[in-house]
Amino acid sequence: MLKIERDQLAAQLASLNHLLQSLPANDYLGRLGFEARRDALQQQLGALAGAEERRAHIALYFGGDPVVGSVGVQAAFGTNVIGTFQDLLSKVWGALDGATLPQMGPIKDKEASQLHITTIVHGSFGFLLEELEDQTEPMFQTPLSQAADQVANYIASFAGENDASFSQIIDILNPRVFQAIRDFFGYIHKGKATFRLVEGERDQEFDHLAVERAWNRAEASNVAEERIHVVGRLLGVIPMKRRFELESDETGTVIEGRVGEKFGSTYLERISTQQFAGKRWRALLHKRTVTKVGREPTDNYTLLELEELPQ
């Protein structure tokens, strides 16, 4: 993992420079040896400076009650946390680029999202998880690496002090991804553990306060999705903004939201110009309900299908 390698080399270089400064002026042989080692480290660092990490590499270090120094971690804790982290990564990977993640059941091609434990890392105790499926060097960042970036961002947003960042993230989370994040922090919180996450150029530590904050947010929040049919009057469609308004026959309330990708721009123009508005339709809507800490649930709607009814 490039960041860990660079950090380790930088630490060795700093230690070596300190030794060189402390050497007696007449210790010529010692100085030659240390300078040769220093030059080699600088060369290694220079080679890594321009390197780009395109595959998924994640290091998870643990502290707190389940960990015995840098010697070991409780087996049940380690198994559960690594398992839920992999589950979270697989679900984020399954929803990349707007792909549909089913509400339940297996994730398509899930095996392609699996990481491998390649190394036990020390400095507390942890694991290095790496993408190993394709041994040829990719030209671009792999989808699994993109998913790892998102996972790290979600974890940081749940545990961070910025409420606005958390609020923005939960507004877009798939319910299964949300549940996986809740499970991950649930095991960390229950185990009275702390952790450090290294992914890409991100290196972030999560103390007991951060874990408690993330767990409280996950417990007090919820994300639910369902498809519903609504019969009512189409009040209007704004093609440029892809927005709609529909008055429900049953409740009399006006439902507004986003028009789904199924509806092309030409079709939306027809709806807005050919007196489709005011007519009765049977609409299939995607309803998303988000519950946040200390707030009333909010509903968001996406129009999926329209079926014209006899007027």
Please give the residue ranges for each predicted region:
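Protein-protein interaction interfaces in oligomeric scaffolds
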Residues: 1-208
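Long, positively charged binding patches that form subdomain-scale interaction surfaces
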Residues: 155-270
